Regions:
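Conserved glycine-rich Rossmann-like NAD(P)H-binding loop of the short-chain dehydrogenase/reductase
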Residues: 25-37
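NAD(P)H-binding glycine-rich loop region in Rossmannoid oxidoreductase-like domains
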Residues: 62-101
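N-terminal Rossmann NAD(P)H-binding glycine-rich loop of SDR-like oxidoreductase domains
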Residues: 3-23
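Conserved Rossmann-fold NAD(P)-dependent oxidoreductase catalytic core, especially the SDR/UDP-sugar
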Residues: 107-155
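SDR active-site strand-loop-helix element
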Residues: 6, 30, 80-86, 121-127, ...
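Active-site helix of classical SDR
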Residues: 156, 160
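NAD(P)-dependent short-chain dehydrogenase/reductase
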Residues: 135-137, 166-210
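Rossmann-fold cofactor-recognition segment
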Residues: 48-64
Length: 210
């Protein structure tokens, strides 16, 4: 069993990698620029007391079909956890790059699941796909099967996540592959350095740090 974790040096990705290594699972962690985050990534793993003997850290641009083909040609990958994604602030500053990674890149991974007979792919979508929730739902709880449309969306990020979900459903129904997604809410914790949600990070960590 060997897991490919895209965005593996990122805020969520490195936590996923650590948990896999703790279970003695072989991991290929990739990111578009591993040099930039390598020190923080290695420091984080050291705090979790996990061995890196089952880990390979590689550079990968998921928007490049050639890069992906090379990975799957060189390694026997059984599962994919796709954490590599452009956040709202990066999408707004460079929409073309955002679309290349978030739409083309994710679709490349769905295709790779089919082409390489991957056991299962999992990716985080977002609770933001529900749109401006108070306007739509009022104070009632939101359920997983509640409607997610475009007319109440504020963020390109959420619309891209909706498209990812739609494409994943197409691959599942048309090609009988196993792709699952989650819809996490705001993800915060120590170590986040850049995000449009830094307010959540500061709200949680500043009181603890004094």
């Amino acid at each position: 069993m060997k897991f490919l974790v895209t965005g593996g040096t990122g805020f969520i990705g490195k936590r996923v990698v650590a948990q896999l290594l703790q279970r003695n699972i072989d991991v290929i962690a990739t990111d578009i620029n591993t040099d930039k985050e390598k020190n923080d990534f290695e420091d984080y793993l050291s705090t979790k007391n996990v061995s890196s003997k089952n880990l390979e850290l590689l550079e990968l641009d998921i928007s490049s079909k050639d890069d992906l083909k090379k990975i799957f040609r060189n390694y026997t990958i059984t599962n994919i956890i796709a954490c590599g994604y452009q956040m709202s602030n990066l999408i707004d500053s460079n929409p073309i790059k955002g679309a290349e990674v978030n739409i083309v890149g994710m679709t490349n991974l769905f295709q790779a699941v089919m082409d390489n007979k991957i056991h299962r792919m999992v990716f985080p979508s977002s609770q933001s796909v529900y749109g401006t929730t108070s306007e739509i739902f009022g104070n009632k709880p939101i359920h997983e099967d509640d409607y997610c449309g475009l007319q109440h969306q504020l963020f390109t990020y959420a619309v891209m996540k909706l498209l990812n979900e739609f494409m994943a459903q197409k691959y599942v129904s048309m090609h009988n592959v196993s792709i699952a997604c989650t819809r996490p809410s705001v993800v915060f914790g120590y170590g986040r350095k850049r995000s449009s949600l830094m307010w959540a990070e500061e709200f949680a960590t500043n009181p603890a740090l004094g």
